[in-house]
Regions:
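A structural signal for short loop-to-beta-strand junctions that line the ligand-binding cleft
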Residues: 4-7, 13-14, 39-74, 104-108, ...
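Extracytoplasmic/periplasmic substrate-recognition and gating elements
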Residues: 56, 77-78, 167, 206-272
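Conserved N-terminal structural module of periplasmic/extracytoplasmic solute-binding proteins
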Residues: 1-23, 39, 82, 223, ...
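Hinge/lid segment of periplasmic solute-binding proteins
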Residues: 18-67, 91, 118, 215-217
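Extracytoplasmic/periplasmic solute-binding protein
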Residues: 53, 57-61, 66, 91-143, ...
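C-terminal capping/gating helix-and-loop segments adjacent to ligand/active sites or protein-protein/ligand interfaces
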Residues: 293-353
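Short, solvent-exposed loop/beta-turn-alpha elements that line the ligand-binding surface or hinge
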Residues: 33-43, 48, 126-156, 206-209, ...
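Glycine-centered hinge/linker elements that transmit conformational signals in sensory
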Residues: 94-95, 138-174
Length: 371
């Protein structure tokens, strides 16, 4: 929110990480274009998030594969011999950690707030295996948060959190979690796992003497017998459209160096941004897991997800309140997960209708809604 507010001053600086809640139709008013997307796609990946009308306004700092940071030693001591591939198997693994070790099975990082928003990153590719879901399926689909009954889709993601909290498989008091402190805690075996992007792995490894104990597993959802992992950009470098030409040129050169020469993405355990660059060892557990990159929205609908998302006030990937509410309701027991998503679906449907979208059943991977 701070940087979005500062953008209104025009003289905020030369380079920033583009706010994720900036609407696509605002990009050209704030940032220069790096060039046309078709040309840039030849050398760089994960450009869809800040591409608009054929131009690219943000170059990713690194790419994230969405999974779970975990302590391998804790899982081993708990008797978890195979990484869980479904929500049921994951909750069972957390229960084993609780029963057989002194570690906190799943650390929510509730108090930090922004960390809770990480859960939104799993409802697309990880939960559906569908590159069209986030920019088409959820936009046009009917009741996208409903329980599919097969442990897939957005409901399955959020229900993992709900069940972990309600079954007391998290810290005793989520309001007292400590983001900086949790890094050392997972490093030394006091925490079993945390739901965070691959960007977090290196931080956990460097927080103590047990770097080799830190691993990264695919998110435990299986769609038609196969696991998927959402892959997307971390913060993207944007260059101020209001800066003078010399500063814009210098900024462009600096972003090029950061992307192509600095080794930043590899050092952070991220997906490389340059086509053909080497993947880091931390993603070894993703061998056989298909990475899913969201397709761009259909032409003419580039702003539609953002508009519905804002109108619904759910604010996926923009706010953490809806995810924190899951924890609060699970703790108090005053609402089931089904009741929570009923409210979300109603708000989403109302927002769809506000923007002249008639929701219809959507099948993952189909790319179309039912007639």
């Amino acid at each position: 929110e701070d940087i979005k507010l500062r953008l209104t001053t025009d003289d905020w600086g030369d380079i920033c990480g583009i706010p994720t809640n900036l609407q696509k139709n605002e990009l050209e008013d704030e940032f220069i274009s790096y060039g046309d997307k078709e040309t840039l796609d030849e050398n760089y990946v994960l450009l869809n998030n800040f591409a608009y009308n054929g131009n690219v306004y943000g170059i990713p700092s690194t790419g994230n594969a969405q999974g779970i940071v975990y302590n391998k030693k804790v899982f081993e001591e708990a008797g978890v011999t195979e990484l869980p591939k479904t929500p049921t198997e994951f909750i069972e693994a957390l229960q084993k950690i609780k029963d057989n070790t002194d570690a906190i099975p799943l650390y929510t990082n509730f108090a930090a707030g922004w960390t809770m928003g990480a859960w939104d990153a799993y409802i697309g590719g990880c939960a559906t295996g569908d590159p069209d879901f986030m920019n088409y399926g959820i936009v046009h689909g009917e009741n996208p948060f409903a329980d599919n009954g097969d442990e897939t889709g957005p409901f399955a993601v959020y229900n993992i959190l709900y069940q972990a909290v309600s079954q007391e498989l998290v810290e005793d008091d989520p309001t007292t979690t400590d983001w900086e402190g949790c890094k050392g805690m997972i490093n030394n075996g006091q925490i079993g796992c945390m739901v965070l992007g691959s960007w977090a792995v290196v931080q956990m490894q460097e927080a103590g003497d047990n770097a080799d104990d830190i691993g990264y597993m695919p998110f435990p959802i299986t769609v038609d017998g196969k696991q998927y992992a959402s892959a997307g950009p971390d913060y993207c470098y944007g260059i101020n459209v209001h800066s003078d030409y010399d500063n814009q040129l210098a900024s462009m050169i600096y972003v090029k160096w950061l992307t192509e020469e600095s080794n930043f993405s590899y050092d952070q355990g991220g997906i490389p941004i340059c086509v053909g660059d080497e993947y880091p060892e931390v993603l070894a557990a993703f061998d056989g897991v298909e990475l899913v990159v969201d397709n761009p929205a259909p032409e003419g609908e580039e702003d539609l997800f953002g508009e519905i998302n804002t109108e619904s006030e759910i604010a996926l990937n923009n706010d953490n309140t809806h995810v924190q509410n899951i924890v609060e309701h699970a703790l108090s027991g005053d609402m089931t997960m089904e009741e929570i998503v009923d409210e979300w679906n109603q708000a989403w449907t109302d927002a769809q209708e506000e923007y002249d979208v008639t929701p219809a059943p959507y099948v993952y991977g189909s790319g179309v809604v039912a007639e």
